Amino acid sequence: MANVIKLRKGLNIHLKGTAAQTKRVVGACTEYVVRPDTFEGVVPKLVVHEGDRVDVGDALFVDKNFPEVRFASPVSGTVKAVERGERRKILGIRLQADEVQKYHDFGRRDVSSLSADDVKNALLEAGLFGYIYQLPYAVSTNPQTMPKGIFVSALRDMPLANDFEYELQGNERDFQTGLTALSKMATTYLGIGKNQKADVLVNAKDVEVTVFDGPCPAGNVGVQVNHISPVNKGEVVWTVDPTFVIFFGRLFNTGKVNLLRTIALGGSAMASPMYVDALIGTPFSVILKDALTRQEDLRLINGNPLTGTKSCLEDSVGVKTSEITAIPEGADANEMFGWIMPRTNQFSTSRSYFSWLMGKKAYDLDARVKGGERHIIMSGEYDSVLPMDIYGEFLIKAIIVGDIDKIEQLGIYEVSPEDFALAEFVDSSKLELQRIVRQGLNMLRKENA
C-alpha cells in the first residue's frame, strides 16, 4: 500500500475557465519554432544551419557545456531560419515542415532488459535526455552525475492546471515503460494525489508510489522531494515531468521520437476552455485561432497563472507548456474605493473580502499586481503556503543580499522557483519571488562551478 503524506500548508485558488475534458487535435502547420531558452540552464550550440534537412529526432542543438546532450527536432523538414537576439543569443530555430513526416528510427527496445547505461545512452542519442531536470539548481541535468533518486509528480494542482489523468488516457503503456526506464538509472519515486484513481498511477510498477493529501502546492516536485528525500549539499536528485515520461516510453516502445503533448487551454478569456494535442514548437497563433474572447486587454500566459510566463501569439509550445492561459489584463478595471469596498466577487487570502465564506467559488481574476514593491514584512505569509522545512522569508532576504553561506544553510538546494509561486501570490510586499529564487540558484551554481 502506498505511503500517504498529509500536508496542511498551502492554498487552492479556484479560477474561472478550467479546461473541459474535451479535446481537439491541432492540424498540421507549415512552420514550427523550437526555442532553446525554454530549457533552463542549457547553453545552446547549433548543429544545424539554415537550409539543412532534418528528420524527427535529429539533433537541432546541443548543450555547449555537455555536448553529448542533444535536443531533438519535433518535425521533419528544412531549417528555414535561426532567430537571434543580443550578442547572437539563439532565440528560436524555425522549421519548414514536410507534408509527410519522416522519422529517425532509433529501434525498439525492451526496457526490462536494459542497463542504466543503455537507458541513458538511448535518451542521449534520441535527444531526450535534456528533458530531465535536477535539484539542486532546477536546471537541465548534468549526464555525468549519479542521482540518489528520480522524482516524478503526476499531481498538477496549480490554478487551471492540466489534469494529468486526462492526458494519460491512451498513453498508459508508454507512461509505464518510461517509469521502468527511469527506474533502471536510480530509485524512482512517483507522487500522486489522493483523488487520482488511474490504475497506472495507483499501481505503477518499478517505482515507489507516494500519495500526497493536501492543498496546492502538494503537486510540486520540489515539495515532494522535501518530504521524501531532502537534498543536502553534495547530493543530486533528478526530476521528470510526467509528460516527458510518456515521451521516453514512446521512444522505447516505437523506436521513434514523438513530442506530441496534451495542453490545457484555460482562463476566463478562452471562448471554450478545452484540451488540445500539439507538437512542441507549434505556434500559439495556430493553437489559439478563434479560441479567444478578446484581443485587447488580454494577458496570454505560457503555462498556468502562477508559474507561467507572459506570452504572445508569436510564441510557440515549449518544454514547460502544459497549459496556455488567457485572462484579462485588468488595465481597464476601475474599482471604486479599491480594497476598502466590501466585495463578493474578489478573492482574498485574508478576510478582507468574503471569499473565505464562498467555499470553492471560482473567480475571474486579472493580471494586476494591485500595488508596488514594499519592504519585506516578516509576517509568516510565506510559511503559511510553503509546506517545506525551510525558512522562506529568511531565504529570500539572504538571496537578495547575496549571502552564499546563508542561502546554503537555509535550504536552497531543494527548492525551485515554482515552489515560491504561492508565496509570491500572497506576498504583501509584491516581490517577484520566483525571479529572486532563480537568481539565487544561478548565483549558487556559478559559485560552485
What are these regions (language model features)?
Residues V42, V48, N65-E68, S272:
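Short, solvent-exposed loop/turn positions at domain surfaces
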Residues H49-V62, A81:
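Short, well-structured beta-strand-loop connectors
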Residues D58, K64, V75, E83, ...:
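Glycine-rich, histidine-containing beta strand-loop boundary motifs that form or position
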Residues E68-S76:
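Short coil-to-beta-strand transition motifs
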Residues M1-L15, T22-K23, K80, G85, ...:
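Mobile cofactor-carrier "swinging-arm" domains
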Residues V69, E83-V286, D290-A449:
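Buried, small/hydrophobic-residue-enriched core segments of structured protein domains
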Residues M1-V47, V62, F212:
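N-terminal, Lys/Arg-enriched amphipathic/low-complexity engagement segments
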